[in-house]
Amino acid sequence: MTHWITLLAVEKVAKEGGLFDLDATLPLMAIQFLLLALILNATLYKPLGKAIDGRNEYVRNNQLEAQERLSKAEKLAEAYEQELAGARRQAQTIIADAQAEAQKIAAEKVAAAQKEAQAQREQAAGEIEQQKQQALASLEQQVDALSRQILEKLLGADLVKQR
């Protein structure tokens, strides 16, 4: 029985209104919707859009600034690396020059020491030769003196003087 009451109520409503009634509610709802859209636009959408646009601009500026700083840092790093490589090459050149100079000085000192040693050897050989000659001369005199003494003892002093 309750179903019959519900069906009768539905039939009565369906006969009266149809799809919708054209009265003052529809234009009033449209005005309310437009008014709500204007209020929301003024109070929410425009400030929110401005905030989003400001944030996008801030992010874009920071990104551009970061890219500029990165490129400057890369350029500075490259310049530093080039300067460092130049300094290394210069240091290697200085080291090589110093080593060559040290070898040259060492070779000169060795040559001078060899010359000095050779001169000392020659001087020592000369002194030895001179002492040898003096020793031979001294020995010759001693041999002559001894020979005379022997002859004097053997032959006598008078015979040796006649000769």
Swiss-Prot record:
InterPro entries named in the record: ATP_synth_b, ATP_synth_B-like_membr_sf, ATP_synth_b/b'su_bac/chlpt, ATP_synthase_B_chain
Membrane topology: Single-pass membrane protein
Compartment(s) where it occurs, according to its Swiss-Prot or TrEMBL record: Cellular thylakoid membrane
Keywords: ATP synthesis, CF(0), Hydrogen ion transport, Ion transport, Membrane, Thylakoid, Transmembrane, Transmembrane helix, Transport
Disulfide bonds: none
GO MF term (any one): proton-transporting ATP synthase activity, rotational mechanism
CDD domains according to UniProt: ATP-synt_Fo_b
GO CC entries: plasma membrane-derived thylakoid membrane; proton-transporting ATP synthase complex
Keyword Amino-acid biosynthesis recorded: no
Pfam families xrefs: ATP-synt_B
Record-annotated membrane-spanning stretches: 28-45
Subunit structure: F-type ATPases have 2 components, F(1) - the catalytic core - and F(0) - the membrane proton channel. F(1) has five subunits: alpha(3), beta(3), gamma(1), delta(1), epsilon(1). F(0) has four main subunits: a(1), b(1), b'(1) and c(10-14). The alpha and beta chains form an alternating ring which encloses part of the gamma chain. F(1) is attached to F(0) by a central stalk formed by the gamma and epsilon chains, while a peripheral stalk is formed by the delta, b and b' chains.
Biological role: F(1)F(0) ATP synthase produces ATP from ADP in the presence of a proton or sodium gradient. F-type ATPases consist of two structural domains, F(1) containing the extramembraneous catalytic core and F(0) containing the membrane proton channel, linked together by a central stalk and a peripheral stalk. During catalysis, ATP synthesis in the catalytic domain of F(1) is coupled via a rotary mechanism of the central stalk subunits to proton translocation. Component of the F(0) channel, it forms part of the peripheral stalk, linking F(1) to F(0). The b'-subunit is a diverged and duplicated form of b found in plants and photosynthetic bacteria.
Family to which this protein belongs: Belongs to the ATPase B chain family.
Descriptive protein name: ATP synthase subunit b'
